[in-house]
Regions:
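PLP-dependent amino-acid enzyme catalytic core
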Residues: 3-417
Length: 417
């Protein structure tokens, strides 16, 4: 994602503002548009790590993410001349719907430029909110360039997804809500892409209680902000590789970089495996649908938890399609040792399949799928057949036990996954 650059003087101008007052103003702007999301205590994570873990479910918002806060605050602060000309944004995700919804509420014309790769579901959702959607280019950068071109041509106000002071002040209202409900919170875990969400929350929280730790979380394949802070200057990643597309940003914003560098206490990294497991836990334990970027803070709890600590995780959004959910659930089940697939060679004689089935049943392995192929063998002249079995298991220790029992009965097991 390219970033609309701010001049150095602009960054310093915004850094010197009264952040608390501007975020309180944003709260006032938003009061008739959205309700504060509640803090939900996670009994699962609290028991798992012997601390108090709370979730802040921004996936409960209209349009399914926190983005409405910043977009609406930006539009609410526009002058009448700007509003009359309309607004424009570029996005393939939550920002598009946040801007479209906010513009509809304020009665302002909105144009959203989306790349060709945008799922039809998101295109239609954005159109349903009254926005004029333009499909352009093969990647986000192409859509961004087109949006800037149209902004200059027609005088539209560009609503940046993160590197805008009014936008991040809107996101900062989340921080106010947390402190109103849990004033003795120790740490707040926040996903980082371009940095708008964490910047806003950091400004809000640190202006009221500087002792609260603000912790950023990034996927291992999208570490632009972490690398930039560590190197002391804005860095651009050559490539991105993460399932958490909502935080897949090659370069942080100029303003968000300065705020993060000054106010964020630490940035931790999580793996793709961590993220997939967190999606599964969100569904199974929290009974809550959250997108991959949304659960990134949950994936980092084990890295920050300690006895008695009060931790809040920002669940930034819940816009995820059912096909993706299905795939991630399966990967999460495999990762947590809930499913195992293995192959075993059997002598091609009666009773061998039954013996395997009995051993699995005796060890509480529920067979999900079984393929018994007499024409499939490692050595075609060995007079053996290959059996492939997928079983439901109860964790990695259960898998180890099953493999051990089969091997004790002279079966050679090859793990597939």
């Amino acid at each position: 994602m390219e970033v609309l650059p701010l001049k150095k003087d602009d960054v310093q101008f915004y850094m010197a503002k009264d952040h608390k007052q501007n975020i309180l103003k944003a709260k006032e702007n938003l009061k008739d548009v959205l309700k504060p999301t509640p803090l939900i205590k996670s009994d699962f994570y609290s028991a798992e790590y012997n601390c108090d873990v709370y979730l802040k479910p921004e996936n409960f918002q209209n349009t399914g993410s926190f983005k409405i806060r910043g977009a609406y605050n930006k539009i609410a602060n526009m002058g009448p001349n700007e509003a009359a000309k309309g607004i424009i944004a570029s996005s393939a995700g939550n920002h598009a719907q946040g801007v479209a919804y906010s513009a509809q509420k304020k009665g302002i014309k909105a144009t959203i430029v989306m790349p060709n790769v945008t799922p039809l579901l998101k295109v239609e959702a954005t159109k349903s909110l009254g926005a004029n959607v333009i499909i352009h280019g093969d990647a986000y950068d192409d859509a961004y360039s087109k949006a800037m071109e149209l902004s200059e041509k027609h005088g539209y106000t560009f609503v940046h997804p993160f590197d805008d002071y009014d936008v991040l002040c809107g996101q900062g209202t989340i921080g106010l809500e947390i402190l109103e409900e849990l004033d003795n919170v120790d740490e707040i875990l926040i996903p980082i892409g371009g940095g708008g969400l964490i910047s806003g929350i950091a400004l809000a929280v640190k202006s009221i209680n500087p002792n609260v730790k603000i912790i950023g979380v990034v996927p291992a394949g999208s570490t632009a902000m972490k690398v930039s802070v560590e190197e002391g200057h804005i860095s651009r990643l050559a490539s991105l590789k993460t399932i958490a597309e909502g935080v897949a940003v090659k370069q942080p914003g100029d303003l968000t970089f300065e705020i993060t560098k000054k106010y964020v206490d630490d940035i931790v990294t999580v793996t793709e495996k961590d993220i997939m497991e967190a999606v599964l836990i969100s569904i199974e334990k929290q009974k809550m649908i959250a997108e991959t970027a949304g659960v990134v803070p949950m994936a980092a709890i084990r890295k920050r938890a300690s006895a008695g600590k009060k931790i809040v995780c920002i669940i930034s959004g819940g816009n995820i399609d059912v096909v993706t959910i299905s795939s991630i659930i399966n990967q999460g089940l495999i990762s947590r040792g809930r499913i195992m697939c293995f192959s075993v060679e059997l002598p091609d004689k009666p009773g061998q399949l039954l013996k395997i089935a009995q051993l699995l049943a005796e060890n509480d392995a529920n067979v999900i799928e079984l393929e018994h192929n007499q024409f499939k063998a490692i050595d075609r002249y060995s007079n053996k057949v290959v059996l492939e079995v997928t079983v439901e298991t109860n964790g990695h220790s259960h898998i180890d036990k099953i493999v051990s029992v089969l091997e004790d009965n002279n079966f050679t097991v090859t793990r597939i996954y």
